[in-house]
Every structure is written in C-alpha cells, then in structure tokens.
Amino acid sequence: FNASGVATRALSNVKADQVIDQFTHRRAMSHLSKGRVVIVAGGTGRPFLTTDTAAVNLALELDCDVVIKATKVDGVYNRDPARYPDAIKLDQLTHDESVARPDIKVMDKAALGLASEQQIAIIVCALLKDGNISRAARGEAVGTIIR
C-alpha cells in the first residue's frame, strides 16, 4: 500500500512486537483519523470465532465502510471454481443473497449475516494478484462486492 501511495499501518491482535504493532482501538482510530488504511491481522485470538467474523467485528468497532477479504480466489463464484471449471464468478451480490445462497462458501455465514445486519460491504478478491488489495482500498472494482 505505502509503495502505491496509500498510507497504511498494519496492526496485529496477536502479540508480535518485533514485527508489527499490537492492535488497540485507540491506535487504530488514531491511524484512521490521519487518513491511513489500517490492516489488522490475527483475528481476535478467541476460540470459536472465525477470522471472517473477527474482521466484520473489527470493521464495526472501527466504524469502517468495507471489509476486504483477500483470499485464494479472485471473487465469489456460484460454486467451487477449484472443483468446477465452469463455475461463474459473480461481480456483485446483495447481503441477503450471500446469506441465503448455500453455494456461497467463500466466507462463513455468521460473518456474512453480521455484515448484512450492519450493512458493511465486503470485497472478496485474490490475495496474490499484484495490486488487488490496493485497488480495492482505493475503491476500484476488483473481485466481488457484497452489499
């Protein structure tokens, strides 16, 4: 992000002080108030709470408009593209569709339901495609948007 001109700070819920600053609400809000993109790694460190749900919870806590889920696929498909070569990529979905459709498996239903209830958009894009996350953070069309 920083290299592409987007001011960014990474924080972690898992203690790793030599590598990354620890997440605190105050630290994250300070970075956000300065116009920086905040990336939070490490989930919540709590059992029975997926990283997907943790991401949506953090978005709520930090009053974010969008969650970017960078993953191994380049968006949401109507079925598993690894198993079905004829799977169709969906450019956008409503929250209701993402929760109701059993074929949507890129995120857990608890996270999708919480995002739906709180009207937080989710962008699903490929982690390893160069520039994807930066483009998503700048509001450019990438992957699939759920809103």
Can you describe what each PLM-predicted range is?
Residues F1-R147:
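C-terminal catalytic "cap/lid" subdomain
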